[in-house]
Amino acid sequence: YGATILADYTAPSDGSTQAYVTYIQNFSTSYPEMNGLLMSSASGGGGETVLNTLKSLVDPGTIKICSFDTFEGMQEGFNDGWLSCLAGGIEIQALFDFVMLYNAVDGHPLADGYTVLYQNFIFITSAEDCENYSKYISNPEYMIYDADTIQSMTVRYNPDCTLKTLTDIMDAYTLESVVATATE
């Protein structure tokens, strides 16, 4: 993609966000040409800390953040030009893991042996995406899948259910599909 890695850091695992402040201050001083940050995780206060640190060091949009995970203030971050992309939405993975377990315990395993399920990320690239993400995906009051869809993933309620039934539902999971279903 034409990116040049100028430096890297290890995200703190102790819950402290001060290390983020130090890293970002050092990077912006050592690499004034730096125009982006790729964060492998913005959870645990990392996203908020990096964004606030950048705000104190450079003009909006000078250094853009692209990250896995979502965080408080992301909508404002897009509006103000600090963010270019966030990847999230994997909270739903637990449903598919549970469905695999449920079918197996119910005597109808969907696969022989160990199976890897790949969950789509939801890519957020604008403030509007943030609004929809917050309203429909990270909102515990909203059900992404209704009872009929969940039952369709089980052999007990859908004798034609297969692993492909489940993976087709997983593959169709996008921000656009969730919003379309919600607004029908």
Predicted segments with their positions:
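A residue-level marker of the well-folded mature domains of exported/periplasmic proteins
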Residues: Y1-E184
